[in-house]
Amino acid sequence: MLRETWLCVILVAFVSHPVWLQKPHKRKTQLKAAGCCEEMRELKAQVANLSSLLGELSRKQESDWVSVVMQVMELESSSKHMESRLSTAESKYSEMNNQIDIMQLQAAQTVTQTSADAIYDCSSLYQKNYRISGVYKLPPDEFLGSPELEVFCDMETSGGGWTIIQRRKSGLVSFYQDWRQYKQGFGSIRGDFWLGNEHIHRLTRQPSRLRVELEDWEGNARYAEYSYFALGNELNSYRLFLGNYSGNVGKDALLYHNNTVFSTKDKDNDNCLDKCAQLRKGGYWYNCCTDSNLNGVYYRLGEHRKHMDGISWYGWHGANYSLKRVEMKIRPEAFKP
């Protein structure tokens, strides 16, 4: 009886759980694993290809960069070589022009000594008994290459014979002009004017003196004189040359500008990173920048103490005081009243 009972239990369990009817899963799992491995191999191959491409691009970029750097270095070397050659050529050219100036000056002095009837400036007119201050016309001089020139002569101050090259008294003429205007001159000969750098250069080929007359807004007058005054030619940017100072205006405010070249708003020749002509609103022999600014802005009474770009002479009233009146005049060193 017991045996028959165990057989019945085993039979029921076998029928309830027909393991023999279930399908195996092992093959499906193996297929999935094989597919994943294939995808991984493809991804690794793509990553390897990308890494190789990036490496090649990086090497090419580095090679191109080295090539560019080498080209830049070659260009810089070539540029420095050209600058050196240009500087040497300019130096030789400047030396030649200085020699020409000296020869022309010597020739001019010879002509002055041998041509008693020649009229070169206001001192020549004075020697011919023209003793009234005012406007005169100097005849053209073919030897010196100078055209007819209208000038204002001071026949009274300190013995007379002065040719006025600059005047500031009314403020009606702007002195914030370009290179061309300062070269040829501008303004009204009876009012405010600049005679012109080219004319001043020609007039000072013979040894000359400079007199600067100043007047402030309180009615005080001062002057400064220089035993020698000359301008170089345009190729030398109208370089300023001054001799010894004398006068009653205090500190010599032109000394700082001696041996400097002329600058204008469109031609920056100063010795400064700043563009002094634009800062000081004039054309002048700016150094870095100035101890005087006789071609600055004309400020009237009430405004004359507020600006640093006015008509100034630092040795008298300082940098912020704009003067009421200025005259610059020249005559030959050899002049005798």
From Swiss-Prot:
Disulfide bonds join C122-C153, C276-C289. Glycans are attached at N49, N244, N258, N320. InterPro entries: FIB_ANG-like (IPR037579), Fibrinogen-like_C (IPR036056), Fibrinogen_a/b/g_C_1 (IPR014716), Fibrinogen_a/b/g_C_dom (IPR002181). Residues 1-21 form the signal peptide. Residues 113-334 form the Fibrinogen C-terminal domain. PROSITE patterns: FIBRINOGEN_C_2 (PS51406). Pfam families: Fibrinogen_C. Its main location: secreted. GO terms for cellular component: extracellular region. One of its GO terms (molecular function) is identical protein binding. It comes from the Eukaryota. The keyword Glycoprotein applies. Keywords: Coiled coil, Disulfide bond, Glycoprotein, Secreted, Signal. Residues 30-110 form a coiled coil. GO terms for biological process: blood coagulation; negative regulation of vasculature development involved in avascular cornea development in camera-type eye; regulation of extracellular matrix organization. It is found in: Secreted. Homotetramer; disulfide-linked. NCBIfam families: GGGWT_bact (NF040941). Has a role in the formation and organization of the extracellular matrix. In the eye, it functions as a mediator of dexamethasone-induced matrix deposition in the trabecular meshwork, the tissue responsible for the outflow of the ocular aqueous humor and for the maintenance of intraocular pressure. Is a negative regulator of angiogenesis in the cornea, and plays a major role in maintaining corneal avascularity and transparency. This is Angiopoietin-related protein 7. It comes from Mus musculus. The gene is Angptl7.
